[in-house]
Amino acid sequence: MTHLPGLLQHEDYVRAVFREAVPPLTPEALESRVEFRVRRRAVLDGAEAPECTFLIHEAALRMRFGEDRMIKSQLDHLLNQSDRKNVTIRVMPFAAGGFPSAGSSTLYVSGPVRQLDTVQLDVPTGSAFLSADTHLANYRSVLDRMEERCLGPDPSRDFIRDVMQDL
């Protein structure tokens, strides 16, 4: 929850995040990862683009992975992405309190065939994928609880603007 979702990351932000990798990445590996992450954002484009809802904790909005100017640019990028009809951004402020799985970044991918749903957990050594019914039910419950504590889309945009003004 301390990083913004990869699909919403601005190129400079991606680079700053990967500079913190342990062990450190070679310049070539860093640029390769940046290029891949930036190209991956294309999934949000086009007529067949999926509808995506991103739940973002205030901690991720306030985490510093570079200079204030770059962070402002990243937050402005979030606002621009939230203008897309297939992108919904909802912020969970600190005031919402704790929630299950607070320490991990979770991607829940669902579609018309429920048996193909998958959960991706980002961990320091890579990603873990879960598809067992019990795991899916648990993570769906976690996300439902998080959604209850998040601001709506318009208040979330206002919140992001407020964070930008704090910089």
Descriptions of predicted regions:
Residues 1-167:
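Hydrophobic protein-protein interaction segments
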